[in-house]
Design a protein with these regions (language model features):
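Two-component/phosphorelay signaling modules centered on CheY-like receiver
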Residues: 11-32, 36
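Acidic, metal-coordinating helix/loop segments flanking the phosphotransfer/catalytic sites
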Residues: 32-48, 56
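CheY-like receiver
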Residues: 120-143
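Alpha4 helix (beta4-alpha4-beta5 surface) of REC/receiver domains from two-component response regulators
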Residues: 62, 80-99
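C-terminal output helix
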Residues: 86, 104-113
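Two-component signal transduction core modules
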Residues: 49, 76, 99-100
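Conserved phosphotransfer microenvironments
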Residues: 47-70, 84
Length: 143
């Protein structure tokens, strides 16, 4: 099966949340720390950045603030702690394209990413084994 990648997305500090994006036509560049992500940006072209607001090595949105200062035109999605209003306000004030809480469902996360990146039509791809079917199953999540 051939899947055409429609966007390069850098994720920072998301851990298991990255799995929710596996069905989208994205090339994921997953990093665990802000400093690691900053170094990777020297060599990688990205269409979007998705990051936790508070990273272990860069607190209070420092990574995203620095990134937005250099590349304000690139869409960013930020994960904040559920119920932390100060963090949410700070993330929204940074100019993020979307602010989600860490308890956001995978389905809503996928839909948000698809909408922000302009992935329209068939964007979620689920393959099943050839023994079950000759074709892949496609799911429409962005309208």
């Amino acid at each position: 099966m051939i899947v055409l990648v429609q966007a390069n997305v850098l994720t920072v500090g998301l851990g298991d949340k990255n799995e929710a994006l596996q069905e989208l036509p994205l090339r994921l560049i997953a990093m665990s720390s802000g400093s690691e992500a900053a170094r990777s940006l020297k060599n990688e072209r990205v269409d979007s950045v998705i990051s936790k607001w508070d990273l272990d090595d860069m607190k209070n949105g420092l990574f995203l603030k620095r990134f937005r200062a250099v590349k304000p035109e690139i869409p960013t999605i930020v994960f904040v702690k559920a119920g932390d209003r100060a963090q949410e306000i700070a993330a929204r004030s940074s100019g993020a394209s979307a602010v989600l809480t860490e308890d956001t469902t995978d389905e809503f996360f996928q839909t948000t990413v698809a909408n922000i990146l302009g992935l329209r039509g068939i964007v979620s791809i689920k393959t099943i084994s050839p023994a079950e079917s000759e074709k892949s199953q496609y799911e429409k999540i962005a309208k």
